Structure formats: C-alpha cells, structure tokens
Amino acid sequence: KPTYKKFLGYRPGVAVIDDLIVGIENSDGNTNVRFHQKDTLKRFFERFEQNGLTINRFRADCGSCSEEIVEEIEKHSKSFYIRANRCSSLYNDIFALRGWKTEEINGIEFELNSILVEKWKGKAYRLVIQRQKRMDGVLDLWEGEYTYRCILTNDYESSTREIVEFYNLRGGKERIFDDMNNGFGWDRLPKSFMAENTVFLLLTALIRNFYKAIIHRLDV
C-alpha cells in the first residue's frame, strides 16, 4: 500500500542491538508508526528474554512516545530514552526554566536542562531539554529565538549531557538502513506481497549479521 511519501511500500519495525539487526516485523506502508507498535515491541522483548538477553537501555524516536508504548517498554527495559513530541502545554514550564547549562556537543553549542513532567495522568518522567539559538535569526511563533528538542526518560541519575549524547548515538544506527537499502536491496523489495517481502527482509538481515560477525572475527 502507499507510504506517507505516496509510493507503494512497507513500514517494517526493526530492532537493533549494537550493529546487529535483532528483530523485524513488517506492516503496510500506509499504517501509522504507532499502529500495533506496542505488540511488536512486546514480541521483540519476549524473544530477547527467552534467549537470556536483558535490555538495560532502550532508545527510540518520537514515534514511540505514547502512553501504552512507554508502559510496555518499562516492563522490559531498565531505562528508556525517547524523543518527546512537541507538547504546547509544556511550553510555559520550559520557557520559565532557569539554570540552563551550556554544553558543546559535536562542535555545536547547546543549552541543556531537565524537569519532571506529568506526561500522562499520574505518571511523572524526566524531560531532558536541549535548546539551540536559531541560526537564521527568525523568531518561531511558539519557540521564539530557540529551537527546542526534548528526550523523555526514566533515568534520573545520568547528567543531561550524558543523556543527550547517548540518545544522539541513535543517529548512527540510521547508517544500518543506508547499508540495507544500498547493499541488500531494501530500497526495492522484489515481490508484490508482504509475506514474501518480509522473508526477504529477514534473510538479508541475517546475511548482513553473518557478514558483520565474520568481519569482526577477522578484525578487519
């Protein structure tokens, strides 16, 4: 079915540990990113646990920032770090914050802070806030002279910088998808049916994992 970009395709859910693809479930291209995501994650986590794996830290983009998904993640992972979607109800609290700490991360200067928020009724989490002055000088209607990005977490011990740096490592995992698209045919799936294409996704992911394991053994 058509994706949000209006071409035919699929929207697989993919789990990655380190540099290895450890879980794949497929869905039609026009499904919302949160559609049955809780169920997909539950199956991923249960398979890990059946194989003796314990998840210490889980990170995901804003597509996972919903109450039922976060509840499921908390059952299986000690800590989570999820990009929080924009919430206008929090703007007043964020704008009133004092004590911003200036940090340089990857050569870019940011200001960091954190607050406790009741994201969902009766559930408080830590919101780590990262802001950067707009380079174009244009004032945003809601955010003013800064661009704000937030990370929702249940980690109350790590510093704001440590949390931002850990979450930013997620960007490196996007290169895995570049690798799969360019080297293993994920950009153009071979069949017309989801079941066959899911098999293709699984087999090519296994091949890549074997390749990475061999390269690691050879220490190349």
Question: How would you describe each model-predicted region?
Answer:
Residues F210-V220:
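A short, flexible helix-boundary coil/loop motif
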Residues K1-P2, V22-N26, E67-I73, Y91-L97:
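Short acidic, glycine/serine/threonine-rich loops at helix termini
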Residues P2-N51:
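Electropositive, glycine- and tryptophan-enriched low-complexity nucleic-acid-binding patches
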Residues S79-N182:
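An anionic, glycine-rich sequence signature occurring as long contiguous blocks
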Residues K1, D19, I55-C65, F80, ...:
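Short, conserved catalytic/metal-binding motifs centered on acidic residues
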Residues T160-M194, V199, L203, I207-Y211:
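Short amphipathic alpha-helical "interface-anchor" segments enriched in bulky aromatics
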Residues T31-Y91:
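Domain-level cores of phosphate- or acyl-group-handling catalytic modules
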